[in-house]
Swiss-Prot record:
Keywords assigned: Hydrolase, Nucleotide metabolism, Nucleotide-binding
Molecular function GO terms recorded: dCTP deaminase activity; nucleotide binding
Catalysed reactions listed for this entry: dCTP + H2O + H(+) = dUTP + NH4(+)
Name assigned to this protein: dCTP deaminase
Subunit relationships: Homotrimer.
GO biological process: dUMP biosynthetic process; dUTP biosynthetic process; nucleobase-containing small molecule interconversion
Function, in words: Catalyzes the deamination of dCTP to dUTP.
Protein species of origin: Colwellia psychrerythraea (strain 34H / ATCC BAA-681) (Vibrio psychroerythus)
Active-site residues from the entry: E138
Protein encoded by which gene: dcd
Domain of life: Bacteria
EC number assigned by the record: 3.5.4.13
Biased composition (Basic and acidic residues): 172-183
Residue segments, region Disordered: 168-198
Signal sequence bounds: none
Amino acid sequence: MRLCDKDIEQYLDDEKIIIEPKPDSSMISGVSVDIRLGNEFRVFQDHTAPYIDLSAPKGEVQEAMNSIMSDEIFIADGDAFFLHPGELALAVTYESVTLPDNIVGWLDGRSSLARLGLMVHVTAHRIDPGWSGQIVLEFYNSGKLPLALRPKMKIAALNFETMSSSAARPYNKREDAKYRDQKGAVASRISQDEKVNK
């Protein structure tokens, strides 16, 4: 069951859901909380790699990732990050979110931004029960013009769904949780995935 605005406010007041800094009531709508853009970004650099073999040995995957991903880029408040048409970039939410073991979060883009071609997540919009940290955004500009994105602008909406019971394996207790307590525009850690050989 999705939480309505009254429930979201109560869960925030009771600290069952923690969003830092805590949103004021103007950021809470009927079923969601507005989330703002943070200051950290990463882009894919010019490179000569013909491809990344995602099933290669971990070291090779990490080496390929290091060759294409930029260091973290900090954009000061008031300045803009420009996302060009056809470009993929990573960013991070201004807010940090902590969920209990019995709530899953869903991050959705804003319709007004989507109508300009901005996707705020490529496929990863689920926030697992037990999550704690900032949320990395996978930006893609499918429009025709560059988009100027500024820290602290409203960038997405987060809504919450109660589960039938608490998760037996919440994110914060999993040994394979690669993004636990995430801060900043963390690049893919796919090289840490366990290889499954069948």
